[in-house]
């Protein structure tokens, strides 16, 4: 895990989708998708449920994102 991955994660939560997060961060969508996949595999949790309307955080994902926000605030 690194700070960039945490920023991507928080942006997905904030903007509701990987593509919207990529646009807001001026980042490549595949990079954000890969970062999300890496975090989910590293921590063995599903952070978001994927749907046709966007990304919805799971309960575990919501807690993980709250921790990520705290790290980014410091």
Please annotate each region the language model reported.
Residues 42-43, 64-74:
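Alpha-helical linker/hinge and terminal dimerization helices associated
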Residues 17-18, 36, 50:
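Helix-turn-helix DNA-binding elements, focusing on the entry/boundary residues of the two helices
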Residues 10-28:
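Short helix-boundary/capping micro-motifs
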Residues 2-5, 29, 61, 68:
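The N-cap/first-turn positions of alpha helices
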Residues 22-23, 58, 62, 69:
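Residues within alpha-helical segments
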Residues 6-13, 58, 65:
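Hydrophobic residues on short alpha-helical segments
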């Amino acid at each position: 895990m690194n700070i960039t991955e945490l920023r991507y994660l928080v942006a997905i939560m904030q903007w509701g989708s990987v593509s919207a997060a990529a646009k807001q961060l001026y980042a490549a969508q595949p990079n954000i998708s890969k970062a999300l996949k890496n975090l989910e595999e590293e921590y063995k949790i599903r952070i978001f449920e994927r749907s046709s309307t966007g990304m919805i955080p799971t309960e575990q994902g919501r807690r993980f994102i709250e921790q990520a926000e705290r790290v980014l605030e410091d």
